[in-house]
Amino acid sequence: MAFPSVTSVTVENVTFPPTVKPPCSPNTFFLAGAGVRGLQIHHAFVKFTAICVYLQYDALSFLSVKWKTKSTHQLTESDQFFSDIVTGPFEKFMQVTMIKPLTGQQYSEKVAENCVAIWRSLGIYTDSEAEAIDKFLSVFKDLTFPPGSSILFTVSPNGSLTISFSGDETIPEVTSAVIENKLLSEAVLESMIGKNGVSPAAKQSLASRLSHLFKEPGVCDPQSHK
């Protein structure tokens, strides 16, 4: 199902539809938010990827309990709000579409660096996470991503991270790899929208769209999602 206010979002000529069905899940997810990821290089802001985050509909009833009375600004400024999205007991789906070309090594090493930094700051970097990072890097090792190609992640509450690839903006029917590590699955999303997330624009989009959805009649009723 889709609610009237769940619309598509266009980021740098990449249009993310209101709903998707990931290749490894029987569920349809709604578009929670999207934005650009870029870096300030000298005096120019260089845009590298367009990032979107989809959530299972159950996320609305879970998140609204604590956050439905908050404004968009309050949600945007709250690290705990984004932490609740990252760790919540519902599926998440992220799509990263290239604006600039990147190699698999360039992309995966930066993500891995961000994940390890998160774990070290929390004192939870163990051999299990180091092994998961090695698996993550190996999935991307020999790949290249031209503009318009996409990397897709599905995060399951049971702790699995499913990785898929697409030559364009479409959702593939097959998966490329599954890594069973809960901390890694959460850290990949955390690196996008967490406290030091790489896409402030995506965070702003999430806060705005979810703030409005929380206030829609019936949206936060779990029965309305069945």
UniProtKB/Swiss-Prot annotation:
Alphabetized UniProt keyword annotations: Flavonoid biosynthesis, Isomerase
Function: Catalyzes the intramolecular cyclization of bicyclic chalcones into tricyclic (S)-flavanones. Responsible for the isomerization of 4,2',4',6'-tetrahydroxychalcone (also termed chalcone) into naringenin.
Biochemical pathway: Secondary metabolite biosynthesis; flavonoid biosynthesis
Protein's UniProt keywords contain Isomerase: yes
Record GO biological process: flavonoid biosynthetic process
Family in the record: Belongs to the chalcone isomerase family.
Protein name: Chalcone--flavanone isomerase 3
Source lineage: Eukaryota, Viridiplantae, Streptophyta, Embryophyta, Tracheophyta
Reactions listed under catalytic activity: a chalcone = a flavanone
